[in-house]
Every structure is written in structure tokens, then in C-alpha cells.
Amino acid sequence: MSYSFTEKKRIRKSFAKRASVLPIPFLLATQIESYAAFLQANLEPDQRAPEGLQAAFLSIFPIESHSRNARLDFVNYVLGAPPFDVKECQQRGLTYASPLRAKVRLTIMDKEASKPTVREVKEQEVYMGEIPLMTNTGSFVINGTERVIVSQLHRSPGVFFEHDRGKTHSSGKLLFSARIIPYRGSWLDFEFDPKDYLYFRVDRRRKMPITVLLKAIGYTPEQILENFFSFDSFHISRKSILFELLPERLRGDTARFDILSKSGKVIVQKDKRITVKHVREMQQAGIDRLEVPEDFLLGRVLGHNVVDKETGEILALANDEITETLLGKLRDANVEEIRTIYTNDLDQGAYISQTLKIDETADEMAAQVAIYRMMRPGEPPTEEAVKALFIGLFYAPERYDLSVVGRMKFNRRVGKTELDGPTTLSNEDIIAVIRILVELRNGRGEIDDIDHLGNRRVRSVGELAENQFRSGLVRVERAVKERLSQAESENLMPHDLINAKPVSAAVREFFGSSQLSQFMDQTNPLSEITHKRRVSALGPGGLTRERAGFEVRDVHPTHYGRVCPIETPEGPNIGLINSLALYAQTNEYGFMETPYRKVTDGLVTDEIHFLSAIEEGQYVIAQANAELDGDGRFTNDIVSCRHKNEFTLATPDRIEYMDVAPAQIVSVAASLIPFLEHDDANRALMGSNMQRQAVPCLRAEKPLVGTGIERVVAVDSGTAVKAVRGGVVDYVDASRIVVRVHDIETRAGEVGVDIYNLTKYTRSNQNTNINQRPLVKVGDVIARGDVVADGASTDKGELALGQNMLVAFMPWTGYNFEDSILISERIVANDRFTSIHIEELSVVSRDTKLGTEEITGDISNLSEAQLGRLDASGIVHIGAEVEAGDVLVGKVTPKGETQLTPEEKLLRAIFGEKASDVKDTSLRVPSGISGTVIDVQVFTREGIERDKRAQQIIDDELKRYKKDLADQMRIVEADAFVRIERLLIGKIATGGPKKLAKGATLTKEYLESIDPHHWFDIRLADEGASVQLEQIEEGLAQKRKAFDAAFEEKKKKLTQGDELPPGVQKMVKVYVAVKRRLQPGDKMAGRHGNKGVISKIVPVEDMPYMADGTPVDVVLNPLGVPSRMNVGQILETHLGWAAKGLGQKIGDMLRAGKEIVELRAFLDKIYNTSGKPEDIASLTDGEIADLAQNLQDGVPFATPVFDGATEQEIKDMLELAGLPRSGQVTLHDGRTGEAFDRPVTVGYMHVLKLHHLVDDKMHARSTGPYSLVTQQPLGGKAQFGGQRFGEMEVWALEAYGSAYTLQEMLTVKSDDVNGRTKVYESIVKGDHKIDAGMPESFNVLVKEIRSLAMDIDLERH
């Protein structure tokens, strides 16, 4: 087993019993692959598949003019290079996007020619707007902020059958219905009403009898009956009526007359029910015709039109009921045979026939007109309009599209074998659906479960973007059609025809403000990755919160391995927003799949199959925890399995598949909770959600007890920096790592250098701090994929959301009542939970009517201390410590001219005083923020002179870029010179620098004596070597040229003006870093849904301590465990203590200077006594020493979900660490020194500080803004508002009879405008009298009554 560079520095001991068959797939694959398929950017235009952008273009083009004389064809499209990279876009507030150009061909036909001939063809590239690009971490940068497009779970197109569960009609009768849902186009519903008539409706409009639709699509009543019924035949003569008998149709009926055999024996007596036995006897007796009485025929329904053979007159129509009169008429016309439809009350209802009776339309045209009137009420139905509308509804590909998925689902449901076909509806499709619906009503078949994941599919980014792009193109198509007719006469080019604005508007609208385009949750790496793996049932075309019932939100058996049953928000969105399970992926149709191991003849193989929910139902699937022997055979005779969405037991020979891993059913966040199997699901849900709110601490600390997935999450989220290629570290500082790549990994023409510029103190979307730290030293050899730098909340390449705290479960004088948390002062002193938050404050200088606002350091009425922080340009220095109210950027705005008195004019003229014309509108630090300025950015509009500060920022950036290029060049040259040295030594020269003699052999000493750049001047006798030398020289010259061009490009980008909103001349952004220490009121939590608020920070000496004097860090309430049933936290605490104890033992061994052999033996005991074995022997002595050094503060454990450490293993580890097997110890009270009565559970728990900090919530108003109409103070921290004194609070004061307090509350402290000012004046004068007046809200009430035309006045006494 090989370990990566960072893994071998700290190996996590895993308790997993089952070896992993399938590595966890790349966690952002869904997003990245979906968008790559949409763009197809790295494919040649002619190799692109018809999906994504290509499909959108092909579905709209070619566009023909109305006269068919001009046509616009699509050839291909090209995506240009984005003008700015991701970082530049974030700084400048731009969208990271690529220009899209489509090549189109305009063909104009010759009108005059007799047969169609082409007059001219023009081809041209047309700009189609910008398409946002995805960053390599699966997000988008839109207007400078990172956003995520969440995948949507929607109802799959196809056909669905359901019933109303007896809720519509009072009798509780089940009313069946069917619905054909296309990908785009009109919905078609079929439904039964309580009287068993069958109706249809289009797009939920008013219903019409189903036979109207069948007639409209071209069926006659005769054909309709033929399609849905089987017939009984009768032979009529003057004397008798013979009935062609099919005995099985009579079963269950009552005989209306004696049924006799040919010999005259009675088989069934009159009024007896015909049973299966009777039917068998009739078949044996060979009865095929029966003479029946007349009333047996009466009341039956004709299945065809009856025509008089002689006259051609229609005697009776299909679906007519046979009466005595009609029967006489038929006998008179000598009709010999008639067919009636076969129905019975049990399983052959006459629904279609009855519906045909209530249908008043006569023929196809009348039916189509009826449908037209329903769709377009009030419009006159002309024949063309009626035909066009009807064809457009279900038959025109541009208006109606079932999609490939819809056709596949449709064919599967109606029982066809082939899964592809046209994506519009056909007559056969409609007949097939009605047939199944009638069968359902007849009691045969099953309805569909719409919450089954086989009936819901995922639309990912690519598909959502494609739909938006297509909708933009449809708008373009309309405009192009209009203009094409002009193109014929006016000699227009393709770019004159196409206006790309609708396309770019649609795309911008989607990425900027769609419900599914969300501001990325960037609190920590886990919240990023979870946001990108989220699946939402909301959004356009999805559900709404209000309408979604319980069933949709509930966990469904098909969620197994596809959607996490645990992670979902609490509140109104519960169950509507889900998270993809760890191994889940989507198939080509958009249905979720999960992997299983193939089982053949009871032997579990390593062959992996991905199954969708539809396929899974038909197999017998064993759980991941089924016991296997060494060969991979099931050891038990009966194994717990899943089959047809039910849990059952099966013998090994029946099993066809087996789960891949125990963690397969949960999502990333849930799989990070150790001992998840011991937690109640509700608490696990809170735990998953709270991990996403953990604020990155100053120093990340790996969890002592993890689940082994931490490394995968840290690397896949993109926060930890991964080596792109293997090599040797050449240079490291805090902000960049330079790697000299191995020769074998460098392709021809590539630069053999990788430079990793690290992100330093950058603000995330949630104002947390993103900071990367290098993990490598100069000279380290790294391989591709190794972690070279840690990001926020990662520790040596592992996710580290919180800190490991020594916790004790015990009460402490009521300070941990109701989930409060008591913490030690030591935590605060050691900055364990200190976090850095970065606030972005910006100011713009605009061009106003009265003149331009000016950013300047020259501001009147500012103290020296305030001005001292600003530079000459009026912008704060980096590194300045600022408090609330301090000036960050000085800015003055021109004031309107006021009328001056002659005296003032005179003074002005003498002193030239102009300063009073401006008012101070500087950017100040808002209340509640104090910190250090860490960065300043200045943006200037094109054509406006830059100030010194802006210039200096640009120069620094260029210097940094130059350094990168110089490093690359240095390494490239060094590599080249090594190659040249190898080439030259030992070769014969014909001349060269330092008067090199002809025929001399080149030596290392000679080469070292001259500047390597002069080696190119050496002339060689060997022709081949000379050519090689020239090639290397040329290669270096090209590289230099490329680097110079790159530098110039960067310089041009930086020196060109910035794009700013209209009217804005300059924008300054100041970044302030705020340090937040832990304090009472902050919310903290464990990973098991155990959350609480800090109630008190206690001095270290008062905390409970162990016998050796170690004080605990956190005291938690033991009552928080039993009722919440999250026992996982207790097991984590025990195992965490063992981890720490083992680390201390290793530390003692190191300090005692023990031999490496002893260390190896002890490590072997830890790693290889139980759980997954680790290959300690493969590490060198140096690596073992390094590993032991890193394990001193605790041996990290992994206890994977559903496959974790057992109670026995935890006890063994405690014993190995020399700790009590019970995990409990007697503590002493820090205040008195006395021992507590009972042993207390003590250990290490990974505790998180959540992003609900008291600093962000605390706020106090003295005087602030008032609401305009009511003149009452505003509410909320953002508005600097007051506390609401509501109705109930008024009752409280009334109850106490405190009249004056009440009066003060409702008047001068609220909306008595005059009273407020008077109170202020009297307080200033030292007089504490209150004179309350009229509250403004009363005036508002008076005004409202007047608005109702009632004159109301106040009478003053």
C-alpha cells in the first residue's frame, strides 16, 4: 500500500472491517461533467454530439423566410478565450465568461428561376453573447461573486397513471386518471368522472369527452369501438336469434334461460350463476351456437354501422342500442348478422361506449373545432387555424417534445419493447394510454408511484443552461424570420439579421437571478461541496413549498444509495432539498444511479454495475454488511436483502448484487459523523447541517475521531492545493510554491515548472477567511495528486472543521442548564476558537449634477489621528488598526449653491473660502466592526487619471507577476543548461569563446569557466549535436518571447481602465480583517446534533480537574444525551481520549529517546491489532520518526459510518493508552479541591464554533433612523433599529399599572416627534420633566379615516 506525501506524515488508524471495492468518486463530477457536455469546448466543431449548445442551435436552425426564398443555416460555433481569469473577475466584479461566436450560412434562392436554384451564399461568424464558464471547482463567477447552479429534481417526462385516493367523490370511489407530460409542450390529461365517463383535458383547461379527441385524430365511432372492445356475434332470422357462444365470457353471469347441450341435456338451469365448472362442461359439449330469446339481444350496443345491402341506406349506427323497433327494422331489411360490443359489470366496463353517447360532435372537423374553441375561446374557428392549432398541440416537433427520456419512459410504461422513437405523440400512443387507463378502471394493472426515483429525474447545470439558451434562441428566430424577407432584396449579411441580445439576456438572467442559481455557501470546504451536490425539487418547473405534501418530502425506498435520507434542511424546505449520496451519479437519461457489486452463484465479485431505481427493483440485493468468507462467499445461510423496494431475507444463491460500501446510503456531510449508527436520525440531520456552518478557526486541528472521508472532502473541494504534476520543490514562501517538474511528466513544448500561487487572507462569500499555507519544504519530492498546501479548515490535507476539546459530562452549578456550554478561559487564551472574518467595505465617487465627488485626504473637521491613517490620496494605509466610526476613504461631495448674504460674499472674496461648498461623505467603519486593514483595491474609469495609490497597487501586481515569470524562466534555463552540458562534454569543437582551439575536446572545467549563455557560441564538429544545440537555443528564445508577450498582456489588462457602473468615476474597496474570539453567546456544536450556547467562560483554576491536575476544557450537561438519543457523542468522547492518550505515550517515548525499533513495535500495536491493517513496515526510519512526531498530539482514528469501532475495540484502545476501560474518571472541583461523588465521563470531542456569533447579532440603539410615515424607530440590526415594544408588552405594563412608563414608551420613546426633541432639550438642561404630546401614529389614523371621506377633527380644550 503506498501513501501520498502528506498521508505518510500522519496515518489515520481505521477500524473499517470491510475493504473498499470502489474508491469514492470525484465529488464534484456531476456539476463539472454536466457543464462540460453543455459547452463541448475542447472538441472539434465537426465532432460535437447533438447535446448542449450544439443541440440548442440545431433545434432552431435552419430558419426559413416566409416566402421560402432565403434560408439561414447553422454551421458551427466557437468559444473564445475568456478576457480575464477567475481571480481578476472576482476583484473587478466581472463575470467569468467566454465570447460565443456562431458561424452561419445565408442562402438566397433565385425567385425568377423555374426550378429552385441558389442565387448566392454568404457565410459569416456572428457574435452570440457571452457564456459563463465554470471554475475548476464547479462554481461560476457572476458579477464578481461565486455562485452555484443547484441541480433540480423534477417529474420525468412520460406518461403517469394515478387515482385520487377516493378524495374527490363523497362515495370514496377511486377515480383513475392518466397524464402525458412532455419535456416541453402541452400536457394531456385523461380522467374518469364519478359516472364513469372518460374525459380529456389539455393544459388543465375544461374537460371534454375522450371521444372528441379520438374523432379529432381521425377515428370514426366504428374504429373507436373496434379499438377498445371485443364483439359478440348474433345471426338473425325471422324465426330465431343464434348467439355465437364463447363460453369463458359467460363466467360469473346469471343464465336468463336454460342452456342445453346438443343432445338436449341441461347444462345450466335458468337463473343460476354460471361457474368455471359450467364453462368447462360447455366447452366439452362443443356448444358454439345458442338459440337465445329476443330479450337477450335487446339493450345491447351495436359495434358497427348496419347498412341495407340493397338500398345502401344506413339502418343503424355504431354505438346504437338495440331496441325492439330497431330489431324489427333489421329483420325487415334481411340483415343476417350483427356484432355487439362485449361488456360486463366486473371487468369489461362500457366506459368508452357510454362516453361516445354523450359526445355531440359529428365528425373529425367538428371535433377539432370543439378543441379549438376550448383552447382559444372567443376566436372564430377558420379551417386553417383549427388544423394548425391541432397539429401544433401534439404533432409539431417545434411545439411539442417528449424528449428521448420521455419517449423511453412512455414506451416502457405502455409495454413496447423498443425504447426509442419519435419525440412527438402518435395516434397509437394516445390509444395505448387510454387502453391502460380503461384496464386500470377494469381492475387490472397498477398505478404509478410518482415519488419513485424512476419517475423523477435530475436536471443538472448543463441541461438547465441549455434550456435557457434555447429560449433565448427562440426569440432570435422570430426576429430573424421577419428580417429574412428583407435580406432577399437588400443584400444583408448574416450579422445584420441576428441580434444576439435576447440570447445573452436569457443566459444572464438565468445565471444571475434564477431560483436555482444560488450565492455559494462558502463558510467552509464542506459547505461548498455540499452546496454543489445539492438536489432541489423547487425552482422553475418544479414544486412550490406551499403545494408540496408529505409524500414528496418523505424518504422513499428508492432513495437508497441515491439521495441521503438524513441531510435535508429543517423548516419549510424539509425533504424538498436533498443531497446526493456518496457514490451516486446520474445516467444518460438523468436518472440517479448507485453502484453495486455483481454476485454470481453466491460468489461476490469486484465487478461494479451502476443501477437506476427502475432497474434495481427487479434484483435481489444484499446489504454491505453481509458476512463474507475469504473467497467472497456469503457465510450465512440466510442473508438480509432488498427486493422490489422491500427488506426481505434470501438464500445466497438467489442474490444477484451486493452494496458497495456501508456509507453508500448517506451524503458527504452525514458520512463525516463518526458513530452515525448510534445517533437518532433527527439529531444526525442537525449534525450534518451544523457541520456546514462551522467557522474556520485560526489554526485548524484535525478531528481525533473521524470517518476516513476527511481527506477526500478536503482535496475534492479544491481548498487544499493538489500537485498537478510530480516534481521537486524548488522554492517556497507563504504565498507561492515553485515546483520543478520531473522530465517524464513534461510533454514537448510545455514549461517544466508549476507555480502555485496561494490564496492569502481572502474574503469568502460568508465573510470567513480563506488562507492557504504550504505543507512542503524546498527539496521535497512530490507526486501528482499530493497535497502541497492546506486551505481554510484543512489540516495536512484533511478536513478539520473544529477543535478537539477535553470535555466532561457533568452539571456545574446550573451553568449548563438547557444545553448551555461552560468553557475554560484557557481556550480563549490559547486562541483555540479564534476566527478571522473579513469585511469588504466599498465607496464610489460619482459624477453628480453639481460636480464630481472627489476622493481626497483633504477633509475639514477631521482630527489629526483620523487623518494620520490616510495617505496622500485619502485612502487608509494597509495594516492600520481601525475602530467603528474611523474614516477609511476620504470623500467629499459638492453641495448645492446656497444664496449668500453680501457680508458672506465679501468674506469669500477676501479669503477665497470655498470649502463650505462640499459635504463630507467619507467611507467610515460601520458600528460593531473593529480590525486591521489588510487590502485596498482602487478601480478607475477609462480616461480618468489614476491617483498615486492606484498606480502603486498596479506596480506591485506587475512586480509579483514578473517574479513568477522570472522563476519560470530561471528553471527552464537551468533545465536547458543541464541538457546542453550533457550534450557538449566530450564533443569535439571547431571554435568558440575564450579562443577555443579547433579540434579541442570540451570539458566540464571549460564550460564552467564561461557564462552558460555563451555555450551557444561553441561550434561543434558533430553535425547532429550542432542541430540539437540550435534547437535548444531556439526553444529558449521562443519561451522568452512568450513570457514577454504574457507580461505585456498582463500589463495591458492592469493599465486599461476598469468597467464601472454608469456615472461612477472611481471605486475603492477596503478589506478589514476582524478577529473574533470565543465569548458568551456564541453557538457551538458537536457533530451529532448536540448544540448549545456558551453561558460562561470560567477561569482555568475553577474548572473541574483530573487527579493529575489536568483541568477540563468544556463541561457539558449529561441530560442532553438520553432524551436526544445521540449516543455517538459519548463513544466519540471515549475514543478521542484513547487517541490523545496514545499520542501522549508516543510523545513520552520520543522524549525518552527510545529506539526506532520500539516505536515501530508500538505503532504496529496501534495500527494492526484490529480494523484495516496499515503498511507501517514500508516506511523508512526517517518517515517513522516524522510520523511519530506528528502523532504526539493524538493518534487520529477513523470509524467509518455503519462500519466503525466496536465497544470492545474502544476499550482495548483505552487500555493500550493506559486509561480506565470505563472511560470514566473521578474529577475534583476546581473551586474547593474536593473530589466529586461519582466518576465522570471525560474525553476528547471534536467541537465546532458555528457561524452564529453573538458579535453579529448584538446591537443597541441610542438614536437612529425613523420610519417615514409612522415616525416610529425602524427595527433590526441592519437598519440600526430599536427593540419592538409590542401589544403584549403593553399589556404587561397595563397589568402593573405603570401609567407613566407606558405613556413614555408609546410617545416620546417612539413617535411623538415634538416630544422627542423637547425631551432631548430638557435632558441637556438637566431638567428631567417629560411632556408627552400627540403620537404621529394617531395622526396617521386620522388621515386614513379622512381618506374614507369622513371628516374627523381634533377638538382642543
Swiss-Prot record:
It holds the Pfam family RNA_pol_Rpb2_2. Its EC number is 2.7.7.6. GO terms for cellular component: DNA-directed RNA polymerase complex. It catalyses: RNA(n) + a ribonucleoside 5'-triphosphate = RNA(n+1) + diphosphate. Disulfide bonds: none annotated. GO terms for biological process: DNA-templated transcription. InterPro entries: DNA-dir_RNA_pol_bsu_ext_1_sf, DNA-dir_RNA_pol_bsu_external_1, DNA-dir_RNA_pol_su2, DNA-dir_RNAP_su2_dom, DNA-dir_RNAP_su2_hyb_sf, RNA_pol_bsu_bac, RNA_pol_bsu_CS, RNA_pol_bsu_protrusion. It comes from the Bacteria. Keywords: DNA-directed RNA polymerase, Nucleotidyltransferase, Transcription, Transferase. One of its GO terms (molecular function) is DNA-directed RNA polymerase activity. NCBIfam families: PRK00405.1 (NF001616), rpoB (TIGR02013). DNA-dependent RNA polymerase catalyzes the transcription of DNA into RNA using the four ribonucleoside triphosphates as substrates. The RNAP catalytic core consists of 2 alpha, 1 beta, 1 beta' and 1 omega subunit. When a sigma factor is associated with the core the holoenzyme is formed, which can initiate transcription. Belongs to the RNA polymerase beta chain family. This is DNA-directed RNA polymerase subunit beta. The gene is rpoB.
